[in-house]
């Protein structure tokens, strides 16, 4: 069957252009420009790439951004103190902590130290809890990006049976709520689930985010299913790195109605969702 590629890169560029026009209007009216603070700890190659893409997007949209690249040796209290200063800084509308964090740093302590009004990543318990009530201040960027991408391609998911592979706080759980609110019947599975394949074979919509390259093959997929690949993995081959998703694209794409590529699918939509949230924080 003919498969349509969900081109997140193309859609994100269009959204950034619209955001840029809004920023230009704000500048003409001498209104405040959105400000985003980004913090990355250590030298994880993937984290550095993600942050650079976010910085680049800020520049394209006309945002003010500031960047901290901190050592792995930083103490938890030092990071919390930096966040507290940024909470008080009126030039900063959004605070982003690039994940993952070093093992010695408590993720929940860091996230809850961010002012919920500046939690543009949508990970604060306040915002995640509000999402359950369909009234979040900020929606988590990746799951928001997925929903936006589906809407831009006019894909109606209401009434579909959706399976999410991966139950992380960052992607799986927010994605579960987004799909539930969109009218899907949702099952979430993880590494502890037995016979994952049996759930996936019944799914109209599959979302995967587990960080395992080529985990999902085409023979798992129901003919005509929609597949959203959120995984980003770096494989070293022939003296260079290749980016692949959690889905084996070649075998899966021949069975799907819609599929996201990696790279160029969900990643750019995550970045543009961050810009939308930061602009919203500025306007609030």
Swiss-Prot record:
Q: Which SUPFAM superfamilies match?
A: Aminoacid dehydrogenase-like, N-terminal domain, NAD(P)-binding Rossmann-fold domains
Give, as in the UniProt entry, the pathway in which the protein acts.
One-carbon metabolism; tetrahydrofolate interconversion
**GO terms under cellular component:** cytosol
Cystine pairings recorded for this chain: none
Q: Which UniProt keywords apply?
A: Amino-acid biosynthesis, Histidine biosynthesis, Hydrolase, Methionine biosynthesis, Multifunctional enzyme, NADP, One-carbon metabolism, Oxidoreductase, Purine biosynthesis
> Could you tell me which PANTHER family the record lists for this protein?
C-1-TETRAHYDROFOLATE SYNTHASE, CYTOPLASMIC, C-1-TETRAHYDROFOLATE SYNTHASE, CYTOPLASMIC-RELATED
Any idea what job this protein has? Catalyzes the oxidation of 5,10-methylenetetrahydrofolate to 5,10-methenyltetrahydrofolate and then the hydrolysis of 5,10-methenyltetrahydrofolate to 10-formyltetrahydrofolate.
Q: Quaternary form?
A: Homodimer.
NCBIfam families documented for this protein:
PRK10792.1
What this protein is called in its record is Bifunctional protein FolD
């Amino acid at each position: 069957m003919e498969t349509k590629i969900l081109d997140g890169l193309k859609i994100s560029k269009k959204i950034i252009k619209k955001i840029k026009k809004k920023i230009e209007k704000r500048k003409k009216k001498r209104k405040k420009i959105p400000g985003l603070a980004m913090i990355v700890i250590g030298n994880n190659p993937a984290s550095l790439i993600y942050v650079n893409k976010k910085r680049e997007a800020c520049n394209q949209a006309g945002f003010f951004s500031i960047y901290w690249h901190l050592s792995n040796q930083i103490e938890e209290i030092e990071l919390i103190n930096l966040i507290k200063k940024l909470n008080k800084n009126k030039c900063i509308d959004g605070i982003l902590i690039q994940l993952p964090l070093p093992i010695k740093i408590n993720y929940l302590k860091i996230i809850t130290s961010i002012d919920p009004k500046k939690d543009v990543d949508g990970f604060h318990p306040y915002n995640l809890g509000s999402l359950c009530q369909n009234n979040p201040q900020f929606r988590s960027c990746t799951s928001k990006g997925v929903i936006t991408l589906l809407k831009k391609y006019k894909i109606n998911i209401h009434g579909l049976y959706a399976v999410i592979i991966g139950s992380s706080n960052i992607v799986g759980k927010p994605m579960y709520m987004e799909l539930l609110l969109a009218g899907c019947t949702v099952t979430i599975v993880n590494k502890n689930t037995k016979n994952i394949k049996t759930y996936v074979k019944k799914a109209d919509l599959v979302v995967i985010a587990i960080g395992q390259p080529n985990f999902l093959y085409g023979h798992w997929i129901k003919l005509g299913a929609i597949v959203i690949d959120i995984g980003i993995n770096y494989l070293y081959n022939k003296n260079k790195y290749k980016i692949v998703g959690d889905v084996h694209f070649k075998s899966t794409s021949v069975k799907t109605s819609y599929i996201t590529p990696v790279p160029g699918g969900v990643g750019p939509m995550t970045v543009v969702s961050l810009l939308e949230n930061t602009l919203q924080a500025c306007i609030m």
